[in-house]
Amino acid sequence: MKDIIAQFKNRTPKPIYLLHGEEAYYIDRITQAAEDFLLDEHEKDFNLTVVYGKDVNMDQLQEQVKQYPMMAERQVVIVKEAQDIKSWDIMESYFSNPVSTTVLIIAHKHKKADSRTKFFKNVSKHGVVFESKP
């Protein structure tokens, strides 16, 4: 967890973070650190997007992560309650080739993500996977 927060403070993030596991507290801390450190206050209006798994339209999410930031070095897209998303299939091409100016944070709380899925394997290959344990 400290390594991820240090990446955010130093503004050297990876393109994708999968935060998953039983302990929601650490996932919330990392997500808040991303909001606090990756963008300046004046950049957040146009470059910080927070969506919730049960409400997200996956086509729109895919379009959002492929956009370029507005008057900033990067954009940050946070998917909270990602455990409610049934399928990440539409995002597979993005996970294989993420946009370098987007930081996608997937907060998958209260259970582990299935490490056998293509989704998990691609995120592991191109990003950071953090398991939050009690």
For the regions a language model picked out, list residue spans one by one.
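Conserved beta/loop motifs at nucleotide-recognition and modification sites
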Residues: 1-134
